[in-house]
Amino acid sequence: MTSRTAPASPVVHVIGAGLAGSEAAWQIARAGVRVVLHEMRPVRTTEAHKTDGLAELVCSNSFRSDDAANNAVGLLHAEMRRLGSLIMQAADANQVPAGGALAVDRDGFSAAVTKALAEHPLIEICREEIDGLPPQEWTNVVIATGPLTSAPLADAIRGLTDESALAFFDAIAPIVHRDSIDMSVAWFQSRYDKVGPGGTGADYLNCPMTREQYDAFVDALIEGEKVDFKDWEKDTPYFDGCLPIEVMAERGRETLRHGPMKPVGLTNPHNPTVKPYAIVQLRQDNKLGTLYNMVGFQTKLKHGAQLRVFRTIPGLENAEFARLGGLHRNTFLNSPKLLDESLRLRASPRLRFAGQMTGCEGYVESASIGLFAGLAAAADLVGQSLAPPPPTTALGALLGHITGGHIETIDAGPRSFQPMNINFGLFPPLANPPTKGPDGKRLRGPEKSVAKKQALSARALADIDAWIAAHLKLPKAA
């Protein structure tokens, strides 16, 4: 059967059978709706994939922490299991030892997903490339083509929106939890107290350095161990707007002082008579104000080196990172501008997006967005609308980041939306954060942080259960 001949009954077309597309197709079929799942492999392969299996894991076999009480990704695992996720079922069935993490046998995992989708009576798998916009007669489409979206489809999407619709290269600076920054060292101020669009004149957190600290920092950047480009990234050159911080440092010892770390227009209120030799600035990253990104600090340093080097910055000695920096090839949408809360393209609502293309990072995150996209697409087909889960849940917090929780920029300049892993910094703060332990003693330091995460997780699981009961007629996963 050719995929371009629509079945007699209503159907949703899902383009891309990675983790997000596979999960979307599964959720649509579970809701009793027919699905045509389009996968271009093996008709056309990519530089990253090695097989023609659905949901092939190309970079890692780890789904990261499975601790639902203390870790945001573990919490997302738990929510997805409650929602009957195929990806989580296949991961659990093909788990390999990895301590507290959920790691899987790659081949077994992909085979399980492929078998489940191939055997479902409402799912038709078509091996073909969709090399442009889907035909107009496809009125309900989920596009989940991932970071290696083919050029013809990417060009067609951009033609529907504008030149800034798609990015093809991540340039991600580290993002720090606001409450882990030492405010006895750092201070709020914009350069020259400038009030930019949406700003107050005190929009940046500033961390000062002496000359000795700056010199040691530059040396550490240059000496730090770097990540190599993957084979399919090597033909994507740096451009000056996203040079890695260590590449700038290699161009001359004073380069950073005349770039992102310039100390001009700022006065340290903790020591107003001493002018810092260099200053690291952090800018608010989300509307909640819980996350701050390190301005101009995109990097190819390995994660261990980033933690070691960036914690030498005054005020960041105890920094907790929501995500570390990176620079790699990726295709993703300017989702806060382009997508509605149901992940539909505002310029063409028949098209819904899912997975890494929307601006999430990680296997589990991509699959979870596919899960919601599938549920929403199925609801649309029967004339209903599905509100996203509350922002207090892991899935709702991630959707909120993608569709509106991120701020574009404080000062006029290029867009700043970047992909994000799930982390507790995306969640609304607790109304009454825990202050005492079960023994009645006041919580301090790490104990307070652990209690806060556990309270956020407990709230999330209660709220996802309530959302499922109110909006879905899905059995809970066993």
Curated annotation (Swiss-Prot):
Residues 438-448 have a biased composition (Basic and acidic residues). FAD binds at residues 16-21. Residues 429-448 are annotated as: Disordered. It is found in: Cytoplasm. PANTHER family: GLUCOSE INHIBITED DIVISION PROTEIN A, METHYLENETETRAHYDROFOLATE--TRNA-(URACIL-5-)-METHYLTRANSFERASE TRMFO. NCBIfam families: gid_trmFO, PRK05335.1. HAMAP family: TrmFO (MF_01037). This is Methylenetetrahydrofolate--tRNA-(uracil-5-)-methyltransferase TrmFO. It comes from Rhodopseudomonas palustris (strain ATCC BAA-98 / CGA009). The lineage of its organism: Bacteria, Pseudomonadati, Pseudomonadota, Alphaproteobacteria, Hyphomicrobiales.
